[in-house]
Amino acid sequence: MTTLLDPSSRSLVFAVFSVFVVICLMLCVVTGADEDDRALVRSDSRRLRSWQQGIAMGGDTTTVATVTVLVGMVATSGFDGLGVMLGSLIGVVLLLVLVVEPLRGHASLTAADVLDARGSGGPAVRVSWGVVTLFVCFPLLVVQLVVVGNVAAALIGQPGARTGCIVVIGCVMTALAVSGGIRGTGVVMIAKSAIALPVLVVAAVLVLHRFGGDLGRLLDAAAHGSGRGEAYLRPGGYTGEGWVGAVNRIGQTCGMAMATLAMPAVLMRAIATKSPRGARTVGRWMLGELTLLYGALAVVGVGAAALVGEALREAGPAAQVFTPLLLGRALDSGGLLVAALACVLFLTALAAVVDVTLAAGIALGRDVLGASGTTGGTASRWSAALTGTVSAVVAVAVADWNLVVVSTLWLAVCGAALAPVLLYALYWPGFTARGALWCLWGATVLSVAALALSPYASGAPGSILPGHDFRIWDVTIPGLVTVPAGFLLGWLGSVTDPRRAAGGRAGSGAEQGTGDRLNGPRAAHR
């Protein structure tokens, strides 16, 4: 696993990637926003159309971890990997039905502005939302940088180059986020989708062609290649058996759906949607793109189990990140497909990190630091630069950790803390600032505690501290507990708020006029 490409293919990959980075940087500079805070965050309706917004939002939900980890999970675990994809698609549907249209066209710049407009905000809620958003964005950024650093080092054939790869790629991606704003990063996201989706579809077609288009043959070969036999087609390969497996599977689907609904980068683009018709166009393009993408990833994952399953078992869990590249080498010994798939991984990481860095920078600059106007634009850019730099440093420090732990952390916090607050603010008139604070902080602490006391933290070979054992339960995906707890905390904090009992919402009535635009889809047609 030290090298995946011959020298000629390696040169092709980095030549193509370098050209694409230069083009993306130029596009970000040309199409990016000026120093105005609103231009930095919101998309100019004449420069980014609804179908483009839909493609960009679909790209926001597709990180490099999605491509590598999901394909690896399908290859090694079968049914459970497909369950993760199902949870993500459910989250996209919920996002389009419940969130995009109520948010569209509002004067807000961030989701914290929505809470203010609904009367459930305030300075404490704004800062808390910003801090929890950063808590979600940092692990997500770290995962992307570590994955792409590992892949780059393997392609070079020098594992010791991983640190340098993480730092260089982190700097490039931070520069793109700072220079482009949401419009410029949208162009990068669209360009990534235009390249990644066709390559993955071609890989899926080649897999099907290898087995004569017979799905039965493909599944039989995958079951044999995975080493699990018929168990490959049943749940439990990743989530476990018995009641623990059931809790993990339900929590996996529930947590993935809620986290997809509330991803900060996705909300940033949802706010910029222009009209009900534009929201529907965004939804069609986003759902179509992701359905095609996940279908291709599922076929690629099953194909990897069939063709390189033995190599994956011998290499261990750490090799899952290289699954698409190993499959490419098995399908095309000439190296062209490996080169194309490597470019897809680089470009997916590039686009994801750029957008998440921008979302984190805006959360820090506007929500936490409270900057606005021209000052806000400058503060958000400097915050994005700081976020990218810190993420690269942290990625280097935790590069040897189990990345599934880091991924589960941001998914758990996003699904249990951000999603309930957003949905309550949009659809429950009785939601108050106290409820928002209880949900944001309570669900975040509960999510961290649930993972800290699980086998991900200690007591297992792949845990962060394998030499210690302070786990109190065997559940590794706590969504079944944390997501309902987040909703419960938001409800309990609101109904026990003395200011609500006194006859008003805890935010203030000053913004009731603007709140009507956020009362949900029905308000738009009154």
Language-model regions: role of each:
Residues 1-526:
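Membrane-embedded helix-loop-helix hairpins and adjacent transmembrane boundary segments
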